[in-house]
């Protein structure tokens, strides 16, 4: 039985992960953590998420180290925000706890700080902008399209709910990174357009971010040239697709001793 701690326990992703873990053989929720001074601290997290009692009280992140030690957690799952996630990763890795990180919006410095702690403490971690299985097939397909349609104009469009904190999405940034890594030409990423921009340059890969309503996550990459257009799209209609992928990552990382992995590793797409 793999003992799992979940941060952001009452958030959209955290509560879904807790529910799915309780329904999954071989996994056990042993700690649920949310923001400091949370008014529901101490209450059973199962009751707070509509599952009924599961015997795990809601803890807060200011007591993370003590909670991880007491619970004996082997894997910690984090879908929160960039700054607290870095601190969580540093604390967990110091205690030898493996990590599944789905938080996005890291600066390069934050990402480096987090990865340094993971490597220094010799734990295993999966870090991904999107754990949905389908979106990772989308990423894999992008590799081929960028190689074969590299002389086309390329635009990326992403849409998310109005509450999303970062833009563009981590998934859109990852798509741009994959495209750049597979093009046989120079390229540069720009973000939206405004004013008199002049003629589009061949090097541009432009990311457009839309926000509104309750859109879980839509991503499209558009390849255009004279006479034709090819669009590759992925739409998340329920966060369960992300949750299910994260649970696969928990099982994967629980078997690893150290190293930093991504969802291509989890799904054997490399």
Swiss-Prot record:
Stored SUPFAM superfamilies: Glyceraldehyde-3-phosphate dehydrogenase-like, C-terminal domain, NAD(P)-binding Rossmann-fold domains
Name of one Pfam family that matches: DapB_N
Compartments where located: Cytoplasm
Entry binding sites for (S)-2,3,4,5-tetrahydrodipicolinate: 161, 170-171
Catalysed transformations (reactions): (S)-2,3,4,5-tetrahydrodipicolinate + NAD(+) + H2O = (2S,4S)-4-hydroxy-2,3,4,5-tetrahydrodipicolinate + NADH + H(+); (S)-2,3,4,5-tetrahydrodipicolinate + NADP(+) + H2O = (2S,4S)-4-hydroxy-2,3,4,5-tetrahydrodipicolinate + NADPH + H(+)
Chain positions recorded as NAD(+) binding sites: 8-13, 34, 102-104, 128-131
InterPro entries: DapB_C, DapB_N, DapB_N_CS, DHDPR_bac, NAD(P)-bd_dom_sf
Cystine bridges: none
Keyword set includes NAD: yes
GO terms under biological process: diaminopimelate biosynthetic process; lysine biosynthetic process via diaminopimelate
MF GO annotations: 4-hydroxy-tetrahydrodipicolinate reductase; NAD binding; NADP binding; oxidoreductase activity, acting on CH or CH2 groups, NAD or NADP as acceptor
Cross-referenced NCBIfam families: dapB
Family: Belongs to the DapB family.
Function noted in UniProt: Catalyzes the conversion of 4-hydroxy-tetrahydrodipicolinate (HTPA) to tetrahydrodipicolinate.
Protein name (database record): 4-hydroxy-tetrahydrodipicolinate reductase
Phylogenetic lineage: Archaea, Methanobacteriati, Methanobacteriota, Methanomada group, Methanococci
């Amino acid at each position: 039985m793999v003992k799992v701690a979940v941060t952001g326990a009452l958030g959209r992703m955290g509560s879904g992960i807790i529910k799915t873990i309780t329904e999954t053989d071989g996994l056990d929720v042993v700690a649920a953590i949310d923001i400091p001074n949370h008014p529901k601290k101490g209450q059973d997290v199962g009751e707070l998420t509509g599952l009924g009692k599961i015997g795990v009280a809601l803890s807060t992140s200011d007591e993370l180290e003590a909670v991880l030690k007491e619970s004996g957690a082997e894997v910690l799952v984090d879908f929160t925000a960039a700054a607290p996630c870095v601190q969580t990763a540093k604390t967990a890795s110091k205690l030898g706890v493996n990590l599944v990180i789905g938080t996005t919006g890291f600066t390069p410095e934050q990402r480096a700080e987090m990865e340094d702690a993971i490597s220094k403490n010799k734990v295993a971690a999966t870090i991904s902008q999107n754990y949905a299985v389908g979106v990772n097939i989308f990423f894999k397909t992008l590799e081929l399209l960028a190689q074969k349609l590299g002389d086309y104009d390329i635009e990326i469009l992403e849409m998310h709910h109005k509450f999303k904190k970062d833009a563009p999405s981590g998934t859109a940034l990852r798509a741009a990174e994959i495209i750049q890594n597979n093009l046989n030409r120079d390229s540069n990423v720009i973000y939206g357009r405004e004013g008199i921009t002049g003629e589009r340059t061949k090097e541009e890969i432009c990311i457009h971010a839309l926000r509104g309503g309750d859109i879980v996550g839509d991503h499209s990459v558009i390849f255009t040239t004279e006479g034709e257009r090819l669009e590759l799209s992925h739409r998340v209609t329920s966060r369960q697709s992300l949750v299910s992928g994260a649970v696969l990552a928990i099982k994967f990382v629980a078997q690893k001793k150290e190293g930093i992995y991504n969802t291509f590793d989890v799904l054997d797409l490399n």
